[in-house]
Amino acid sequence: MLRCVSATAMRPLVVGSKSDTEGTLTGAMIALALEHLGLPVERRLGLGPTLIVRSALLSGDIDLYPEYTGNGAFFSGTETDPAWKDAQGAFEAVRRLDAARGLAWLDRAPANNTWLIAVQGDLARREGLATMEDFAGAVRRGLIHLAASTEFVESPAALPAFEAAYSFHLPPARIISLPGGDTAVTARAAAQGISGVNAGMVYGTDGALSALDLVVMTDSRSAQIVYEVAPVVRADTLARHPEIRPALARVFATLDAATLRRLNGRIAVEGEVPDTVARRHLAERGLLG
């Protein structure tokens, strides 16, 4: 019996993540923080898009990964519920929903990485585009060609929510729909005018926006769901290792929007390795000893 308990206790904690820049960054931070606690860790970073990583967590193939509060709307099929557009409301809702599935949400980062739309700097300056109201006018004038993920185009909470809130419709012929959810691809397409694109789906904490001379359109009507990143862990794993909760709370408390943009930029723009960026950040904050 003692050997069984010991083997279970020392089984490596499997840390997963999505394949986007911020996912691999925050996944690396989780792994490093757990290793600093003296826990054995197996990394499965960059597993794939949301549904693949989520399924791995539910099946027990991984123990924890960084997820966004707003994705609870999609997990529960309640994208139109206005509660998801409030930071605290979204956190409480997803925590309650996932508790029934044997999952625990830990403390979230103070940064909203919601979906936004950014426009080429030259076009934005020439046409005076700064807000989604301005963007809607440009769409009506036939000026906009958008690069976005299939999920962004099709999800009721993404592009359709913008269209409803700002009274515009972007025809499919003026949308380049790309598989996956990597905004590094859509932002670069917009910046470089690939396939005639001059606007792209981005996230609020993307690190490449300034470097690519993209102007983010302000969502003044709060059309979008709040997406704050937090570790999600299997409840049985947390019961075995309760020290995970305070350790990761200290890590995620350091990740405000400006910090995430800077760290994401080091990876997406400067080409640094996510683990290196994560390790340096945690060391600078005194979280690795």
Please state what every model-predicted region is:
Residues 141-219:
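Ligand-binding pocket segment of bilobal, Venus flytrap-like solute-binding proteins
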Residues 10-22, 39-44, 142-147:
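Short, well-ordered beta-strand elements
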Residues 88-146, 253-257:
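A conserved helix-loop-strand patch within extracytoplasmic ligand-binding domains
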Residues 46-50, 60-73, 89-90, 149, ...:
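Beta->alpha turn/N-cap motifs
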Residues 153-168, 242-289:
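An extracytoplasmic/periplasmic, membrane-proximal ligand-sensing/linker region
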Residues 115-125, 227-241:
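A bilobed periplasmic-binding-protein/Venus flytrap-type ligand-binding module shared by bacterial periplasmic
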Residues 76-106, 169, 194-197, 207-221:
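Ligand-binding "clamshell"
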Residues 21-40, 160, 164:
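Short, polar/charged alpha-helical segment
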